[in-house]
Amino acid sequence: MKYEPVKIERKWQRYWETKKFYHTHPSRKASEGKAKGNYMLLTEFPYTSGNLHMGHWYAFALPDILARYLKMNGHNVMYPIGFDAFGLPAENAAIQRNISPNDWTEDNIKQMTKQLKSIGTAFDWSRVVKTNDPQYYKWTQWMFLKMYEKGLAYR
């Protein structure tokens, strides 16, 4: 019998995905006795400037372990992943490659998603946040305007 990690990992990753094991289940309420408690874990969003590296996993490992531990102990855990997709470095990299900044960003998000899924992270992939999504940044703009109106944002 030969150990084939890629084959075995893919098998279990497909199983977890079909069972929606890492999805958040908002209907599981602690008050109904279906979950021991609700938790939300959030890691910093990787900047979409290229491939992930070991430093990214270093930042994700402890929250990933905690998400798994809480889930295995009956807690409802929301553990989304996001991508920090705005900034001059990404725009400049896209211009240097003669492609649109949006295409550059989306390609990097796809690559990072593939990398993160391949190592079996416990993220809830049904709750991906992308800061370049208008449905996301319209709210950050709204919050900034409210802070500005109240004198909390100034030059």
Where are these regions (language model features)?
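N-terminal, positively charged nucleic-acid-binding surface of large information/translation enzymes
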Residues: 1-29, 33-155
